[in-house]
Design a protein with these regions (language model features):
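Short, solvent-exposed loop/turn positions at domain surfaces
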Residues: 230-231
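Long, low-complexity segments enriched in small/aliphatic residues
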Residues: 236-253
Length: 325
């Protein structure tokens, strides 16, 4: 709760002005898939509501989001509904686990994100409605980079709220490649000379992908719809006033960061609930070695038989008991 209170203070500082009241009108642009991200934003919306702020979610038509007094829904005609988004995501996860090149799947996901962004920006009715709402702050999930575009079009301040993904090189954070492993490099902070060369190669490939494949998709969307004033997507990514990463330094390798990058892991923690009696007895019986909880989150619902069998075999070798959610 201390972390959540600090987060609310930071958001309040962003939206405060001498001529405005403390209550702010916030719009959140969650990704078109990954329901776990939406769960985090709902928790944030509840906390904002309790402090007197008003939160809106920009959600596609057909996406199942239960109503709540803590937030409002702004609907738009997107390319996915809840069922098709989940089917698409699980197919990507299955392909990755089957050995298909990860970056091919990521590019396909990116292509669907940009298609959806094109539909939103191109909807006169949706954009007019959002402009008339006069929001004070827009929260961007960096998985859904359209949030940067929408913040620019609406002319509102924006901050990034991420489950861990960010773009340190694009934001301006130093990345000494000798000890800062690149995302998806499968390296640690202790690298041999060959591994450092590999890390540098991964860094260059990813910078190429971001600057010449990912960001230009959104530049073309803004050019297509005549967005004024003109702005480069790279400048919009770098222009965020605050990056909030829902992870913890304990889970990261040491690396340089920036003053406006804040680690806020743990904001979803809450007092424990009592265990069912039979399960509590099972836990108490593990006093010697303890137990391990295995969970892949909401993004991974199905594992292939081969991978599940290998994981089960590895877990069976542990002295601890295992709870597989």
């Amino acid at each position: 709760m201390v972390l959540l209170s600090s987060l609310l203070f930071l958001l309040g500082f962003l939206t405060w002005s001498p001529s405005a009241s403390w209550a702010a009108k916030v719009i959140v642009v969650p990704p078109i898939m990954f329901e776990s991200h939406l769960y985090i934003f709902k928790t944030l919306a509840t906390a904002l509501h309790q402090e007197g702020h008003e939160t809106h979610f920009l959600i596609s038509e057909g996406r199942e989001v239960p109503p709540s007094p803590h937030y409002h829904l702004q609907r738009y005609p997107g390319i996915f509904n809840s069922s098709t988004a989940d089917s698409f995501l699980q197919s990507k996860v299955s392909n990755i686990f089957s050995g298909r090149l990860t970056f091919l799947e990521l590019f396909d996901i990116l292509d669907h994100y940009s298609q959806n962004c094109d539909a939103v920006v191109g909807s006169v009715e949706v954009m007019t409605r959002l402009k008339e709402a006069k929001f004070d702050l827009l929260l961007v999930d960096p998985n859904e980079m359209c949030g940067f575009v929408l913040a620019h079009i609406l002319g509102v301040q924006y901050a990034v709220f991420s489950t861990g993904l960010w773009y340190p090189a694009e934001v301006g954070a130093p990345a000494p490649l000798s000890y800062v492993p690149e995302f998806n490099s499968l390296l640690t902070d202790r690298m041999s000379l060959i591994q450092r060369i590999t890390n540098t190669a991964v860094y260059l490939v990813q910078r190429f992908g971001v600057h010449y494949i990912a960001l230009p998709k959104y530049d073309r969307i803004m050019k297509k719809h005549g967005v004024k004033p003109q702005a480069a997507m790279a400048d919009l990514v770098q222009g965020s006033r605050l990056w909030m990463l829902c992870t913890d330094m304990a889970l990261e390798f040491p690396r340089p960061t920036l003053p406006h990058v804040v680690y806020i892991g743990g904001i979803l923690t809450k007092p424990p609930s009592p265990l069912p009696q039979d399960f509590e007895a099972w836990v108490n019986d593990t006093a010697e070695h303890g137990f391990v909880v295995v969970s892949f989150g909401a993004g991974v619902k199905y594992l292939s038989h081969d991978i599940a069998y290998k994981l089960a075999g590895a877990l069976a070798r542990l002295p601890q008991r295992v709870v597989w959610r």
